[in-house]
Amino acid sequence: MGVYRIRVSTGDSKYAGSNNEVYLWLVGQHGEASLGKLLRPCRDSEAEFKVDVSEYLGPLLFVRVQKWHYLTDDAWFCNWISVKGPGDQGSEYMFPCYRWVQGRSILSLPEGTGCTVVEDSQGLFRKHREEELEERRSLYRWGNWKDGSILNVAAASISDLPVDQRFREDKRIEFEASQVIGVMDTVVNFPINTVTCWKSLDDFNCVFKSGHTKMAERVRNSWKEDAFFGYQFLNGANPMVLKRSTCLPARLVFPPGMEKLQAQLNKELQKGTLFEADFFLLDGIKANVILCSQQYLAAPLVMLKLMPDGQLLPIAIQLELPKTGSTPPPIFTPSDPPMDWLLAKCWVRSSDLQLHELQAHLLRGHLMAEVFAVATMRCLPSVHPVFKLLVPHLLYTMEINVRARSDLISERGFFDKAMSTGGGGHLDLLKQAGAFLTYCSLCPPDDLAERGLLDIETCFYAKDALRLWQIMNRYVVGMFNLHYKTDKAVQDDYELQSWCREITDIGLQGAQDRGFPTSLQSRAQACYFITMCIFTCTAQHSSVHLGQLDWFYWVPNAPCTMRLPPPTTKEATMEKLMATLPNPNQSTLQINVVWLLGRRQAVMVPLGQHSEEHFPNPEAKAVLKKFREELAALDKEIEIRNKSLDIPYEYLRPSMVENSVAI
């Protein structure tokens, strides 16, 4: 009993405030008090007032909120509510919200310290946990967009999503304005699009318009160079294909007369400097038909050697897998006529674009993050510390993925209009890539070791990914161990175990055979798994997202489709090259989508810089502060390093990494 001081914070996005009246209740261990009608919340503001409570409440557990409307339901975005108990020595309690309050239902906000089911030994939050998860499971249902792929949220359109998963107004306006600009560019380029074919490589300058980056300019000027071609496997938009060779690939059948090449490859293999990039997943994928015109795919293998100065140079390209009973496919080398070698590299770059967008970017980034998001909402109540740890890294993921399924990979979407894997092939490729998606491949310490990339001084992706993983893991361990003091506490947390099973058994459709756990038996294992989730939603997505505008804007460096079959002889000409590369319409579509996806966003939260305080207690704040300090130190290190590099690598700079999959 006594006078309580109450503060209420409203979000800063457009329409976050409300003209409706808000009622509050305080719920303590020993009683409950109705505070009545207290405010009409204003956007980006903090309201403060005092209330004299006659009941003895004891330690506070919840604040209950109800928004009352008469004619119009004007939703309110509540950040948090703070309550300070009576007297100068009264305890201050923080109740995080960070969600929309709408309708007339009563919303219960638990005190923000967070607790597991093991910590909640008195069952003070048990009923709240059960009721919240029951409601969430009806709101967040699993969907199956396409048979054979991992599951997604059940939402055919944005309006089907729970309101808390939709873009807030500032994000929506910025995103949709960019879409309008892309449409206008297509209209402006209509005269170019009516040209049926480019005549020379210089013609691609017609669509290389303003808005490109300095790196895109460098790509345009250097894309033909072998060292530049090899660099992209180390530090380009898709650093996920390259691995160190431990033997010559079985598919590498040498045609007669290539004994010297075979000897060279064996020599590099013995030295440990032989690397490969195998696009075998594209083998057997049906190519698209665009406007009645057949498109083509290849499944290249690239063999590369690591030079003493750190350059990675291609030494052989095989465009297709050998077929039983057929003549071995040709192997292209740098000693071939320049046009043959350039055409072979263009085929590799086109194949890399297909795998980048579907495997590295969509599957390993967007779709995995969506599985984590849906499982988290279904299995972890808002009072759970792992929910609090994860939720900033799940912001906007569901909406951006619904938009992708509606606009990019849908029937008559961008893939069908411009990509050689469109028309259904992209769906088959997603399924095949999913079958090769392992737990270890999502964890840089395991993935980089398995691919033999840890000791390459010029592989800045590997260096930065490993550093970021280590920083994230220390952050996760620090937060996790505040609530889990023993391995048994992990084993006994049935909410945490349910969340893990939901990801592996349900979302990933039974991925135990690929190393994903169905239970968490120790603090170390749980922290590793949670680190994987956060890394996937942040750093890994950024590593393959941020480079799109740099590496894919110059169309010949990443052709969205190929209009002639892969060459079987070495007699390429400029006419054949131009007839193979995308036509003007396809090129325009490519750069517009690349710009939309790859542009730097006005509304962007850097890694670890979320303003939401889901952990208000001092111990957790100290862990977050240390995390941010380590990120800032790494950011400065990368900035200094990049000044000495010919090509700066910035895709894993913490200040550039998005805090969630939001674009």
From Swiss-Prot:
Keywords, comma-separated and alphabetical: Calcium, Cell membrane, Cytoplasm, Dioxygenase, Fatty acid metabolism, Iron, Lipid droplet, Lipid metabolism, Lipid-binding, Membrane, Metal-binding, Oxidoreductase, Phosphoprotein
GO biological process: apoptotic cell clearance; arachidonate metabolic process; bone mineralization; cellular response to calcium ion; cellular response to interleukin-13; fatty acid oxidation; hepoxilin biosynthetic process; icosanoid biosynthetic process
InterPro entries associated with the record: LipOase, LipOase_C, LipOase_C_sf, LipOase_CS, LipOase_Fe_BS, LipOase_mml, PLAT/LH2_dom, PLAT/LH2_dom_sf
Biological role: Non-heme iron-containing dioxygenase that catalyzes the stereo-specific peroxidation of free and esterified polyunsaturated fatty acids generating a spectrum of bioactive lipid mediators. It inserts peroxyl groups at C12 or C15 of arachidonate ((5Z,8Z,11Z,14Z)-eicosatetraenoate) producing both 12-hydroperoxyeicosatetraenoate/12-HPETE and 15-hydroperoxyeicosatetraenoate/15-HPETE. It may then act on 12-HPETE to produce hepoxilins, which may show pro-inflammatory properties. Can also peroxidize linoleate ((9Z,12Z)-octadecadienoate) to 13-hydroperoxyoctadecadienoate.
Membrane topology term: Peripheral membrane protein
Gene3D superfamilies: 3.10.450.60, Lipoxygenase-1, Domain 5, PLAT/LH2 domain
Domain remark text: The PLAT domain can bind calcium ions; this promotes association with membranes.
Gene name tied to this protein: Alox15
Family statement drawn from the similarity comment of this UniProt entry: Belongs to the lipoxygenase family.
Protein name: Polyunsaturated fatty acid lipoxygenase ALOX15
Keyword Nucleotide-binding included in the entry's annotation: no
Domain of life: Eukaryota
Assembly: Interacts with PEBP1; in response to IL13/interleukin-13, prevents the interaction of PEBP1 with RAF1 to activate the ERK signaling cascade.
Domain Lipoxygenase positions: 116-663
Tissue distribution: Detected in leukocytes, lung and aorta.
Pathway(s) annotated for this protein in UniProt: Lipid metabolism; hydroperoxy eicosatetraenoic acid biosynthesis
GO cellular component: cytoplasm; cytoplasmic side of plasma membrane; cytosol; lipid droplet; membrane; plasma membrane; sarcolemma
Cofactor comment: Binds 1 Fe cation per subunit.
Reaction(s) catalysed (UniProt annotation): (5Z,8Z,11Z,14Z)-eicosatetraenoate + O2 = (12S)-hydroperoxy-(5Z,8Z,10E,14Z)-eicosatetraenoate; (5Z,8Z,11Z,14Z)-eicosatetraenoate + O2 = (15S)-hydroperoxy-(5Z,8Z,11Z,13E)-eicosatetraenoate; (9Z,12Z)-octadecadienoate + O2 = (13S)-hydroperoxy-(9Z,11E)-octadecadienoate; (12S)-hydroperoxy-(5Z,8Z,10E,14Z)-eicosatetraenoate = (8S)-hydroxy-(11S,12S)-epoxy-(5Z,9E,14Z)-eicosatrienoate
GO MF, any single term: linoleate 13S-lipoxygenase activity
